[in-house]
Amino acid sequence: MKSFASELSKPIQKPRLKEILKELQHIGVPSPCNLRLYHELISVIVPTFWNGKINSEIDFLLAKCFSTLLGLKLLCVRLDNFVQEANLQNIHLVTVYLELLEKAFECIDLDDNCKLIWESTVLSDHQKQSLWTEFIFFLGNFKITNSMSAAMLTFKVYDDSKRLKASSMADYIGVLSSKLACIISKPAVKTPEIYSKLFHYLLHSSNLKAFINPLIPLTQKFCVQLQKLFADLTVSDQMLFLNQLLLEHNTKYPTNFSYSTARDDRITGSLATLLRLNFSSTHFLRLIEFYWGVPTNLIIKRVEVVCSSISYKESDKKELEKTVDSLFNIWSNAQFLRSYTLLAQESLTIYLLLFIPKLEAKYLNNLSKSLMFSNAISCRLDSLDDDIRMHGMIMAEVISTYSGVSLSNPLAFDVPIMKTTKAKVLKSLSSLKDEFLPIEILNDESVIAETSIEKEETNVTHLEKPVISKNDDLIRGDDLEPYDFPDIDSEDTDDDPTVSRSKTHSPVYVQDLCKMLKDTESFEKQRVALENASKLIKRKSAFGTELRDHADELLQTLISLQNRFDLMNFDEMQMTAIVELLLTCLDICGPVICTNLFVSDYSMRQKILILSCISLAASKFNDDDNERLFPSQLLPGNLHDQFYSPTIEKISDELERKLVFPVMSECKDYAEGPKFLQTRYISKQSEIESKKPLPKANRLSLKVDKSLFLLLTSGYMLASRKTAFIEPLFLVYYLKTLGILFFETFTSKIEGANRMLREYVDVLNEVCRLRSDTPEVNEGLLFSFLAILEISSGRTLANEFGKHLLFFEAYTKFLFESPDQGEKVKSLSAAVLILFENKLSEFRTLALEKLLDDSAPLVPERFGLAGL
């Protein structure tokens, strides 16, 4: 090694350099000699012989030499030194080292590095373990990405057109995950457990999707190495990996909760077989205990129950009963009804209904006689919420059926709520007979779907054109001389490139619209599809079930659409189509769009698009005045779109003015004194009545709570710990959307109003705890306070939400006194404080009493504190 180092320090020819580099492929173990070799390579050889070509043999040999722990760390240290100096004269060296580090990262062989360290003869066992831990920590802590990103940002050597994989977090995770999957797939690897720490680091990274995707093929076959690695993980890592794997399948196999098809049964059975190849029933029991509140579709819930309940071991049956006991303990707790959202309660109820047929009758009989079960059913029957009472009735009926308590006279609640479609669907879950099916069904499913679509297209009968017989005697004109046509018409020739030979027709069916939108290679199809999307949706909503059958697919396609061709008014056409789809199929598209907002990996633009469409749809449900105006009463098209097209900012600003104006008028009268006496003509009663607007039915209030509002609140509470959902830009649109939904809904009395108000207050309380410094976020909070104070009565707020109301008032005072929030926030907070005083002037004592009730029992001395 010393001779190599001295030889590299002198001028050297390329053939001799190649021979030396081939001998230096395994010098990754730290030692003084190896360190000197790397110093000569990085200082002399790399700046001289690196050319950055793809097929260069010297570049490849250098990258292989530096693809060890020592080489990678030296490159990162050299880049960090350049960043600290920030000398632009070193830009050429920085570019060379960046390219070398990128290629060395691609050449990393985890198996070779493992053998290099663990089979070393110069290291002790303790040194081997320490060096391997350092190598895994170096890769899992993203040191390469951090050093490359800092160098690229400082010297600006690469733009977006040429991106290095190792500098991108997602690409870095994807490459390492692919290398890890390649190692695990090798049957010769005897100890895959040594990679469990790297698995842990990548599993807790910021991009789980990039980590999971390369590992999915391993789960589709029986892999002993994956099982060994999975067993060496901690329980929390096991559950996190399984949950993310199921979420990927959740997006791949969507379903409709309203009805179960034979396709769902086949997918459930084959997917359960696929997942049980490498994971035991105990893993899925733990997964349900950990993540029963995660919003997944019915297929995934059925798969989890099948994988966790079908087993021939007595120990697994005991574990199943323990898991059901723990789930029933949560379900029967009185705090569960008050603390968890309705979506989470329904999710746990579905799991229990799916588990009941898998349990023995003796266990269910003992459960039905227990005090825990009796208290749970009685608490739900006493609830004022229809859905909660329905859950209790269904659970009582199903358990009485399967426990054999009343075979001759089964329990049945003959009430209207049990005759609804949702109640029938929930009750039918206990009669599902899921079982393991062959895995090949998953591969055949896409083929079946494609062939069914092709059959539908071929079955469309094309009407033949009517044959019109012409009588030559009638149309013959002997006295008319025909014109002479030229032999060649240059304007109509087929060789004219300006003539469009195939015209793209407007879509007639919803399925055709989806196909045209998905065709990302045709500019004309994208343009025609977007221009006609809203018209086709409105036309199809008037008759038939075609739109409802394909509403989910059309919604997903519209949201994921990108402006690849720079179409004019692309955003407006996309938003108009989504809004029209929400207006016509809110019961189908509402839950899908709200769930995907928090579950799917959407960009910030797509999240803002979803929230804006929800707000516009809510405002259009009860506002159709614009459609009744004659064209003469409207501005020209472009001016009308500019000044009157609704956006979420315009809607929220209009509502703010509507809510704040009465308060400001009262303050102005109080400050300036009473106005002089004004007189006006007293009109006839008939004239007054004729000018009043006609009352309109609030169509939004019939669907908003279960289709939009509750899903938005519960989804945020479950995902509020993720960084993407506490960014100021998202919070601004989210708060304004909730405020618009709340205000537009409560123009008439609706059922479940208290539940909506409670969940709205919980979300605002969670956002207030963030203490955002962004004025726009605080403006959204104040807008929400205005909506709550305007809609709800003072007694209801003080009695139900006294503690939260006083907290909101204190937070508003903090914003009013803060010098960094701006004039708009200060004026809004002043109006909110006045409304707080008006609402709580008579009920402040009641709010304080409720606040004291939450902390400790009332004693006579504390009534004095409350001002009683």
UniProtKB/Swiss-Prot annotation:
Record keyword Phosphoprotein present: yes
Residue ranges with Acidic residues bias: 484-497
Region feature Disordered, mapped onto this chain: 484-503
Secretion signal span: none
Residues recorded with modification Phosphoserine: S490
Annotated GO CC locations: cytoplasm; cytosol; TTT Hsp90 cochaperone complex
Keywords, alphabetical: Cell cycle, Cytoplasm, Phosphoprotein
Biological process terms in GO annotation: 'de novo' cotranslational protein folding
Subunit (UniProt): Component of the TORC1 complex composed of at least mip1, orb5, tel2, toc1, toc89, tor2, tti1 and wat1. Component of the TORC2 complex composed of at least bit61, orb5, sin1, ste20, tel2, tor1, tti1 and wat1. Interacts with tti1.
Function of the protein: Component of the TORC1 and TORC2 complexes required for the regulation of the cellular respons to changes in available nutrients. Required for normal entry into S phase. Regulates activation of the DNA replication checkpoint. Required for efficient phosphorylation of mrc1, which is essential for the activation of cds1 kinase. Also plays an important role in genome stability.
Protein name in the entry: DNA replication checkpoint protein tel2
Source species: Schizosaccharomyces pombe (strain 972 / ATCC 24843)
Gene this chain is encoded by: tel2
